[in-house]
Amino acid sequence: MNDQMFVETLIITSSFFAIAVVLVLSVLLIERIG
């Protein structure tokens, strides 16, 4: 059972989540340094 749509959605969601985490960590790091 290979659900292509589910795989693509999972990849897009994980990528978006990773980018969001990086942005949040960057903001926290800048505020801590600044």
UniProtKB/Swiss-Prot annotation:
Its main location: membrane. InterPro entries: YoaI-like (IPR048191). The chain crosses the membrane at residues 10-30. It is found in: Membrane. GO terms for cellular component: membrane. Keywords: Membrane, Transmembrane, Transmembrane helix. It is a single-pass membrane protein. This is Uncharacterized protein YoaI. The lineage of its organism: Bacteria, Pseudomonadati, Pseudomonadota, Gammaproteobacteria, Enterobacterales. The gene is yoaI.
